[in-house]
Amino acid sequence: MSSLRLRLKYENQSAVETVEANATVGSFLDLVAAKFSLPRNSIALKFGFPPQDIPLVNSDVPLSTLVSSGQQILVLKNAATSFSTNEPAKPPIPNAATKPTFPPQTEISNPPAVSHQSKNTSQDPPYVSTPIGDIALRVMPDDNSCLFRALSKPLGFSPYELREIVANQVLSNPDIYSTAILGKPSIEYASWIRKETSWGGYIELSILSSHFGVEICSVDVKTGRVDSYNPQPATGQRTYIVYSGIHYDLAALAAVLWDTDVDVVLFDASDVTITPYVQQLASLLKNMHYYTDTASFSIRCTICGTGLVGEKDATAHALATGHTQFGEY
């Protein structure tokens, strides 16, 4: 690792900083003090959930032994724990979300008002604000692989590799993934899902969440409903995707709206405080008409040109003809 990218949050200010991998706690503290014009000896640094102190007693300790790139660091002033001698914080789970102090659940039953217009650019993605950053929509290309693209970042595999995992699981578990479940023999389904033109859905979500030991929460734009796949994940991690009827996108905790490199996309599955904000994002998208009514939308098979109405017709057409490329019209 050549450097660490960290999001700093102090009161209503935030910044993303890149520091060398061999940077010490002391040099990082100097950077924070200069960035926010704070006296060095009045600063406390915290990360994780529940928030844990970054020990500041030994300024020569490499920062990389305490935090990971992409994490958020809470900067506090005049904190009693500024120079705590408590046990060093435990290293974070790789790729897990940093979730500093959230209000109690009772305080966020009605999350803050939606923010969706950036003061910097009109091209920022839709987002809602939370106490620790913005939950932003990361839009996937509309290319029939949106589900696999949305899951590629949190799961760490390419869309092609995710399709292969699904196909192999289907073939390896014929008793679970029967013709009745798949709508076709497992061999045919495995061949079909390997194609870039084939849409993924609940079967793929079920398989991938179980395979990776991650809870996948799919939030429906039209209804706000949250469908949870693998709600007791082995890794203790959760990711959120947003479903608009025929399309999947990823919801991320964004350090910078226009920079996806430091997005947080894996969260502690035991903590539900993020969920209401993702639902609020879905509500914002609904108000923007960012959804398709799958029962009545008009769709055309782009292979043969047949006009169809609704998901039911599209599914029947795909099963009857093998055509799996559709577009709205």
Swiss-Prot record:
Keyword terms: Cytoplasm, Hydrolase, Meiosis, Metal-binding, Nucleus, Protease, Thiol protease, Ubl conjugation pathway, Zinc, Zinc-finger
OTU domain boundaries: 135-254
Active-site residues, as the UniProt record annotates them: 143, 146 (nucleophile), 247, 323
Segments of this protein annotated with the region S2 site: 272-277
Organism the protein comes from: Schizosaccharomyces pombe (strain 972 / ATCC 24843)
Chain intervals for the UniProt region annotation (Disordered): 85-127
Name of the protein in question: Putative ubiquitin thioesterase otu1
Region (UBX-like): 7-89
EC number annotated for this UniProt entry: 3.4.19.12
